[in-house]
């Protein structure tokens, strides 16, 4: 899992969103590509992963944000191809006004213990994950109330109109059993306790240092589950995981370094890539010297050569150049290609130019350069990229001292804002809405504002970008926001990355259109026809 943090016009009165499979059917499996293959039941699938959460409490795992969580945890909705919302535990959604969403639940859904899921479970689950102690509470800040209206209806009322909210139940707010959670307060999700959910596979054991075991859920609302048993083995490094793939010990993996993994995994597996919206970037703390000087930040922007940094990341197969905090593909949900290009062409640009970088530094309070510290962990090619960044900044007199730490330490320091005045990382977005990356990185309400950049103008633009219903006005809001960010440069976006799947040649699996964490992707895995 890369540092993947998740984060539509307001409907007319009583509009029904197109998220039903036809009436309120409760027996049809989730939509999605079927792929090619035999269609025969698979006895056991063995997958690999390099890190597991200490436990599976949704409050401590970004709502179970893991490549395999979608196999056993479900949401109200799911995001399908072309960013279409599709049913999962809710069959449809109605909007009687701009701040009210009514979710009509699927009837007959059972938890693994056989108890029926009702609105009480959904309300409890969502309230649990929007509590102040939750690590995803930021995604529910605009929620006023969540209430039940009968056993199969849940009403969410927002504090104000929010154009991005409609996607939220497809990537946040996994649903679990209320009675189980209440009986295991403080221990739910721990190994030996686990959780009660509704997904097609039942979680039967979990040890974050060894493995996760899943078995087919006989109660699943979607019908017969095609794989009887799934084992996820945890490895200390991607190298050891690749060697396990080569030997046939595992059948599937989601490597962070696809190019290197493919070479080590051998010819018995095939690598595929998929590219959800992402930004790989340098952040600078605008509230602390020396990065509180805008000329320093502009010097950094001019000094970084995206071609070199993509090469350090593994080359063109791993990334494509990008320079804006909101990817163009997300802006295109609000306007035509011509309209989006007009917005992007109007932004301040910082192409690689050492002469301009030196000129900007000369105008700063640090004309002779300075030393800054940063941290990095050994994830993917992050070490190689931060070393390349340091080498390029050294050319203009900025000495970046790099401390390599464990992933656990990096995550702790990231959460506490202790990575240093300058840092490199990447965020992936689960929502196609252009509000998602600003909500991660900008303004007073952001949990992940590494730069501490929160001028009142940005807060206002973020609020209006969500409150405005007309796509053209939202595009104007986000265009102005991008212009402000490009002028002040709290972040320098370098490129967009790719995600990878390595799959044994024994199997077929359709391309991913959304994150594995938010879909029951293994439903579509099949044995390859001979």
Role assignments for model-derived ranges:
Residues 320-360, 381-382:
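Structural transition elements
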Residues 94, 102, 138-182, 205:
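Surface-exposed binding/hinge segments that line
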Residues 217-263:
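Ligand-site clamp/hinge motif
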Residues 48-97, 127, 196:
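N-terminal lobe/hinge region of extracytoplasmic solute-binding protein
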Residues 170-224, 229:
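Gly/Pro-rich hinge or "lid" segments in bacterial periplasmic/extracellular proteins
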């Amino acid at each position: 899992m890369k540092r993947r943090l998740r984060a539509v016009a307001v409907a007319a009165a009583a509009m029904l969103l197109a998220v039903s499979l036809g009436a309120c059917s409760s027996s049809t499996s989730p939509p999605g590509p079927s792929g090619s293959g035999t269609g025969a039941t698979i006895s056991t699938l063995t997958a690999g992963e390099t890190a597991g959460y200490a436990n599976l409490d949704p409050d401590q795992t970004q709502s179970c944000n893991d490549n395999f969580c979608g196999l056993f945890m479900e949401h109200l909705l799911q995001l399908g191809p072309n960013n279409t919302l599709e049913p999962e535990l809710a069959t449809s959604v109605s909007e009687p006004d701009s701040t009210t969403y009514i979710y009509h639940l699927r009837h007959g859904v059972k938890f693994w213990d056989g108890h029926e899921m009702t609105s009480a479970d959904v309300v409890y689950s969502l309230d649990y994950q929007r509590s102040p102690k939750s690590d995803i509470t930021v995604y529910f800040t605009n929620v006023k109330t969540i209430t039940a209206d009968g056993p199969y209806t849940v009403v969410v009322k927002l504090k104000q109109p929010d154009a991005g909210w409609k996607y939220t139940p497809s990537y946040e707010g996994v649903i679990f059993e209320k009675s189980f959670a209440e009986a295991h307060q403080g221990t739910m999700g721990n190994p030996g306790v686990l959780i009660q959910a509704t997904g097609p596979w039942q979680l039967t054991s979990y040890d974050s240092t060894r493995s996760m075991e899943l078995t087919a859920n006989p109660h699943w609302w979607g019908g017969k589950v095609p794989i009887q048993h799934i084992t996820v083995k945890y490895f200390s490094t991607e190298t050891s995981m690749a060697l396990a793939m080569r030997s046939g010990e595992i059948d599937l993996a989601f490597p962070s370094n696809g190019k290197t993994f493919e070479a080590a995994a051998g010819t018995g597996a095939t690598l595929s890539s998929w590219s959800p919206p992402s930004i790989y970037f340098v952040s600078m703390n605008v509230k602390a010297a020396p990065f509180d000087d805008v000329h320093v930040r502009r010097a950094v922007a001019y000094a970084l050569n995206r071609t070199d940094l993509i090469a350090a990341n593994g080359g063109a197969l791993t990334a494509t150049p990008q320079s804006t905090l909101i990817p163009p593909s997300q802006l295109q949900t609000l306007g035509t290609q011509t309209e989006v290009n007009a917005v992007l062409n109007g932004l301040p640009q910082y192409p690689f130019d050492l002469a301009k970088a030196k000129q900007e530094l000369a105008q700063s309070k640090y004309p002779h350069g300075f030393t800054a510290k940063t941290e990095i962990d050994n994830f993917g090619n992050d070490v190689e990229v931060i070393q390349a960044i340091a080498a390029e900044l050294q050319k203009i007199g900025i000495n970046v001292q790099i401390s390599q730490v464990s992933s656990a330490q990096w995550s702790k320091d990231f959460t506490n804002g202790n990575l240093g005045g300058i840092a490199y990382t990447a965020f992936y977005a689960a929502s196609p809405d252009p509000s998602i990356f600003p909500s991660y990185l900008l303004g007073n309400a952001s949990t992940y504002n590494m730069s501490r950049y929160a001028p009142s103008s940005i807060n206002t633009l973020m609020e209006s970008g969500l409150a405005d219903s007309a796509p053209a006005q939202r595009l104007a809001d986000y265009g102005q926001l991008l212009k402000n960010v490009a002028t002040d440069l709290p972040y320098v976006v370098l490129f967009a990355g790719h995600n990878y799947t390595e799959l044994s040649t024994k199997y077929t699996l359709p391309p991913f259109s959304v994150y594995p964490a938010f879909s029951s992707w293994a439903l579509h895995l099949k044995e390859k026809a001979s």
